[in-house]
């Protein structure tokens, strides 16, 4: 058997055509058919292409000399019996070649096509290696290893598949990095959003607190103005230097003086009574026409005699300031002094008393009387100058206190704040009188209220011989006029915490429990339906947007200034004919006046109402 295999390997040789056929057979799916085709083709080709010098296994059955090698043919000493193939059984050879088709597929242990490699590596007759055979062998090996199904399959070891795998790995890593980056950004956005929400909330709280403080500040200012306007005598009234010289002496600048401090006021009458008597004599000469009217009694008069009745020293109606002077004035001088000092008109004396006693209302009546006559001018000529200048200028429109001008003026016999509206300065005089409803920076209390309050604080109003005023304290406080400003018209109709509307404030702040108590039922029965609450924040914003506040809650476009009111007054025919009581009209306008940064203003509706009554 071994000899047969060796002989078979030595005698097997395939030409290029045979190799092509062999490759075609190997590519088929049936390995049995491949081996049969190779066997039959090799036998046919060896028989057809048999050449001398080549031995083939098929030549043994035909004729022994055809299968011998060249060396065997050359030696004539060997016969058929000496042939090296004598041990070979021809039957075995034929049976072996046919066994493949009889048995079927060869087992894996049998020699495969790889066993033919030594024969394939033999050189050609020309001594050259067949490259085509080697390339075919490589293709055959690759086909047998991988091809279990028809067609070629891509190899994972190729560079293209490696690049694809690398690309997939890179894309996967990029997606992971991108997702991680997005998560980090989302976390940072959430943190920033939380910080922004916290900052916005804190800013909102601070803004609300600032607005609440601003609202409280406004309410405190309103309350301060309300308290100072309704109190009897504020500490500002006790300081004579608090009056504004620029406001209370429009055309009488020559009568501006500096006076002692507040602590020097009680004893000032000890040194100035002589000057008082001299000035009273000069006033008696300058005003001889005031004597017939001095004895007249008009409703609302506060004469000097009334002041003397209330004197704690028990003085009668007859004594005059001359009795307290060390120079010993005669009774004639007393009677001549009376027309100038104790004036006639009730409203005028009310003003005079206010001017004389507003500074020192806490002292005795004698001290007040001395204080009233004390602050006079330094010379008799100045008193006459005062009389002349007040006839030509707006004396009463700017109510000077007795500390800034001669004590009692002859021109005050007409009205409390008399004005000369027929002169060139008529408009200025009217505006000055109307502006008395407002104060200034140095003295925030309006001059009209100041004078009326100081007049009501005098001890003579209860013992006055005039019975028209009666014992009405509130009428005395406001100069006999009802002023609705004192009772809350100036306030805004808002449900503020610090508003002066204490009824609604306590009802809202301290609601009674619903226990069925009689007081609770009564409060609910008497309680009016509550107005809808306003948006305080919106109101505060609207107030902050306003450049100039005329008065809280008032429309600036509906407010008329003094000049516009004067123009309307001049357009009236009764005013040109002198048929209108301008002083009364001015006092009515003062009750409706409001204070603003630009000066006193009056609501257009109030102006039309007052002027309509005059017409």
Swiss-Prot record:
Family annotation (SUPFAM superfamilies): Leucine zipper domain (SSF57959), YAP1 redox domain (SSF111430)
Cysteine-cysteine disulfides: 562-586, 562-595, 586-595
Annotated stretches, region: n-CRD: 289-301
Transmembrane segments: none
Transcription listed as a keyword: yes
Claim: Protein transport is one of the keywords in the record: no
Segments for region (Transcription activation 2): 409-508
Keywords, comma-separated and alphabetical: Cytoplasm, Disulfide bond, DNA-binding, Nucleus, Oxidation, Transcription, Transcription regulation
Compositional bias (Polar residues): 27-50, 270-294, 322-344, 358-369
PANTHER family, A to Z: AP-1-LIKE TRANSCRIPTION FACTOR YAP1-RELATED (PTHR40621:SF6), TRANSCRIPTION FACTOR KAPC-RELATED (PTHR40621)
Entry protein name: AP-1-like transcription factor yap1
Organism per entry: Aspergillus fumigatus (strain ATCC MYA-4609 / CBS 101355 / FGSC A1100 / Af293)
């Amino acid at each position: 058997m071994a000899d047969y295999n060796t002989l078979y390997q030595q005698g097997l040789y395939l030409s290029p055509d045979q190799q092509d056929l062999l490759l075609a057979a190997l590519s088929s799916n049936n390995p049995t058919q491949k081996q049969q085709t190779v066997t039959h083709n090799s036998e046919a080709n060896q028989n057809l292409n048999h050449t001398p010098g080549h031995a083939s296994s098929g030549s043994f059955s035909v004729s022994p000399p055809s299968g011998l090698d060249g060396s065997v043919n050359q030696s004539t000493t060997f016969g058929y019996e000496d042939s090296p193939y004598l041990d070979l059984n021809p039957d075995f050879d034929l049976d072996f070649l046919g066994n493949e088709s009889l048995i079927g597929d060869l087992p894996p242990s049998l020699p495969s096509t790889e066993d033919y490699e030594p024969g394939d590596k033999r050189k050609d007759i020309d001594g050259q290696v067949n490259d085509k055979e080697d390339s075919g062998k490589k293709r055959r090996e690759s086909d047998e290893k991988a091809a279990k199904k028809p067609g070629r399959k891509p190899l994972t070891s190729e560079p293209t598949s490696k690049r694809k795998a690398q690309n997939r790995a890179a894309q996967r890593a990029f997606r992971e990095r991108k997702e991680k980056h997005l998560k980090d950004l989302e976390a940072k956005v959430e943190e920033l959003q939380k910080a922004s929400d916290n900052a916005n909330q804190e800013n909102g709280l601070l803004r609300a607190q600032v607005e609440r403080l601003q609202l409280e500040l406004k309410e405190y200012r309103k309350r301060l103005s309300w308290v100072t306007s309704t109190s009897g005598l504020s500490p500002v009234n006790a300081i004579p230097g608090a009056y504004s010289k620029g406001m209370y002496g429009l055309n009488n600048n020559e009568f501006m003086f500096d006076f002692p401090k507040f602590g020097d006021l009680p004893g000032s009458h000890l040194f100035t009574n002589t000057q008082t008597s001299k000035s009273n004599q000069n006033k008696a000469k300058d005003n001889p026409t005031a004597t017939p009217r001095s004895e007249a009694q008009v409703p609302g008069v506060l004469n000097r005699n009334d002041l003397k009745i209330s004197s704690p020293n028990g003085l009668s109606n007859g004594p005059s300031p001359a009795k307290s002077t060390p120079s010993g004035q005669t009774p004639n001088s007393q009677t001549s002094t009376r027309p100038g000092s104790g004036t006639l008109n009730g409203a005028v004396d009310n003003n005079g008393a206010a001017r004389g006693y507003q500074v020192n209302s806490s002292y005795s009546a004698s001290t007040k009387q001395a204080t009233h006559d004390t602050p006079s001018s330094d010379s008799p000529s100045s008193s006459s100058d005062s009389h002349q200048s007040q006839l030509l200028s707006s004396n009463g429109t700017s109510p000077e206190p007795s500390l800034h001008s001669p004590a009692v003026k002859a021109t005050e016999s007409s009205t409390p704040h008399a004005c000369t509206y027929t002169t060139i300065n008529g408009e200025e005089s009217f505006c000055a009188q109307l502006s008395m409803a407002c104060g200034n920076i140095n003295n925030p209390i309006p001059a009209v209220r100041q004078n009326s309050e100081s007049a009501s604080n005098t001890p003579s109003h209860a013992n006055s011989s005039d019975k028209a005023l009666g014992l009405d304290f509130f009428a005395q406080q406001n100069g006999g006029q009802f002023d609705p400003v004192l009772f809350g018209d100036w306030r805004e109709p808002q449900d503020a915490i610090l508003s002066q509307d204490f009824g609604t404030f306590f009802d809202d702040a301290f609601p009674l429990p619903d226990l069925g108590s009689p007081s609770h039922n009564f409060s609910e029965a008497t309680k009016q339906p509550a107005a809808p609450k306003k948006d305080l924040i919106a109101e505060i914003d609207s107030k902050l947007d306003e450049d100039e506040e005329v008065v809280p809650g008032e429309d600036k476009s509906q407010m008329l200034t003094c000049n516009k009111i004067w123009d309307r007054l001049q357009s009236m025919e009764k005013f040109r004919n002198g048929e209108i009581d301008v002083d009364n009209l001015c006092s009515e306008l003062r009750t409706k006046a409001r204070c603003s940064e630009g000066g006193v203003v009056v609501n257009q509706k109030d102006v039309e109402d007052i002027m309509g009554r005059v017409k």
